[in-house]
Amino acid sequence: MTLPASWNEICDLFDSYEENGANKLNKFMDDAEKKYSIGLRFLYNSPGLSITELFKKDVLFNANKLQLLTSYRKHIKRHFKNPRLISLLEFPVLFLGTSAESGPALYSLMSYSGIKQGTFYPMGGFAKVIDSMAEICKKNGVKFLLDEQVTKINVLNKKVESVSTKNQELATNFVVGAADYAHIESKLLDIKYQNYDSAYWESREFSPSALLFYIGVNKKLKNLEHHTLFFDEDMEKLSQEIYDTKVWPEKPLFYTCCPAKSQEDLAPDGKE
């Protein structure tokens, strides 16, 4: 299945797999767009410091539209019957640390963002975005310390006063921790300053890691697109193996990225 960039072509694709597929897709995406807008307006910009943030008037008024009590799989199957279309819409949820059966219908907002709004590729790769941000920061006086592993966040009187690294201790006015929450709490803070104990983190379902292969091919691969998802095995079984039985999948699904399809100079001539 080739997923085009054009929305009209995507609608034609859904029509080719299922009767009235385009109409069903538009209804599905209209609903997903509402979830996306609600999430962006009322949840995304909240600091996440207290559960009371969820009790705002606008959030409560729109709560039923988020479908938090309906599974994402059930929501998809209300719209579509074709197994390939179902797999296409279910796949992104695997990266959130859950399955379509367990995750709420709210997660349809991911399909809205990826399929309806579109997926974009910065020329030079995503590292170029980081490089550009770093350049802007440097022009504004920011100093970067690279290869500087943080080993501890030091707290005095309930206030962070410094950060220890393997090389030095740095006094701080404030700290922004962009690492994994569980890592910061359990590895960098003293126990008395942690919000959650080890038992809590052990009971959580984390988003999965990935096994990555970087492969160079000495010829052009005509049947690959920039992004290719292989749905030739049972996705429901895959989800059960990852999240329920917690074993290495017997027949894993996989994703292939071939960026030279969009930017030819990433590979030598005639190669991928």
Model segments located where?
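Rossmann-like flavin
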Residues: 3-102
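Helical element adjacent to the flavin cofactor pocket in flavoenzyme catalytic cores
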Residues: 77, 109-161, 166
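Conserved active-site and cofactor/substrate-binding residues in soluble primary-metabolism enzymes
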Residues: 67, 71, 101, 124, ...
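General beta-strand structural signal in soluble alpha/beta enzymes
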Residues: 87-89, 146, 177
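FAD-binding beta-loop-beta segment adjacent to the flavin cofactor pocket
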Residues: 98-106, 263-271
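Glycine- and acidic
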Residues: 58, 91-92, 113-121, 210
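Mid-domain catalytic core of redox enzymes
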Residues: 151-269
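Alpha-helical scaffold segments in soluble metabolic enzymes
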Residues: 74-78, 132-135, 187, 214
